[in-house]
C-alpha cells in the first residue's frame, strides 16, 4: 500500500497544541497527489494544461486521535471501486506512531472536456 510521511508544520498547530482540524484534508491531498504521481505516473499539473481536471467530488473524514506538535504523520492511500463508473474512492488513513489519527474516503473523478472519466491505469487496479 502506498504511504507518504510528513512532519507536521508548526503553523498547523492550534492554541491547544494539536493540529487544527482544518489542516487534515491538506495532508490527505498532498499524499493523494503523490500517490497519483508515484504509483500511476499521473502528473496533475501537466494534465491540467491538457484540459484534464482531477477533482474531489465529496469526502468523508473521521477524526480518531489528535495530532500534536513535532509529530510525523504517515498517510496511506489506495483506490476502490465506486458505485458510479466515472468515479473512484480514494481511501486514506493518517497514522501517528502506528495509531490511526484520521481516516477519509475521497470520491474523485477526472473531468475531460467537461465529462467525468477515470483513466485506464486506475481502472486496471479496481
How does the language model describe each region?
Residues 1-5, 23, 58, 72-74, ...:
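Intrinsic-disorder/low-complexity, polar/charged segments enriched in Ser/Thr/Lys/Arg/Asp/Glu/Gln
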Residues 1-56, 109-126:
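Hot-dog-fold acyl-thioester-processing enzymes
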Residues 48-76:
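Short hydrophobic interaction/assembly module
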Residues 63-72, 80-126:
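HotDog/MaoC-like acyl-thioester-processing domains
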Amino acid at each position: 500500500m502506498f504511504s507518504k510521511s510528513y512532519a507536521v508544520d508548526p503553523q498547523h498547530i492550534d492554541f491547544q497544541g494539536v493540529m487544527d482540524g482544518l489542516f487534515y484534508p491538506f495532508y490527505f491531498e498532498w499524499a493523494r497527489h503523490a500517490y497519483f504521481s508515484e504509483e500511476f505516473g499521473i502528473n496533475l499539473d501537466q494534465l491540467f494544461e491538457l484540459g484534464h481536471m482531477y477533482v474531489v467530488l465529496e469526502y468523508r473524514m473521521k477524526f480518531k486521535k489528535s495530532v500534536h506538535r513535532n509529530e510525523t504523520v504517515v498517510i496511506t492511500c489506495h483506490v476502490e471501486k465506486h458505485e458510479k463508473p466515472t468515479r473512484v474512492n480514494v481511501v486514506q488513513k493518517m497514522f501517528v506512531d502506528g495509531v490511526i489519527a484520521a481516516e477519509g474516503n475521497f470520491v474523485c473523478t477526472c473531468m475531460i472536456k467537461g465529462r467525468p472519466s477515470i483513466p485506464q491505469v486506475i481502472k486496471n487496479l479496481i
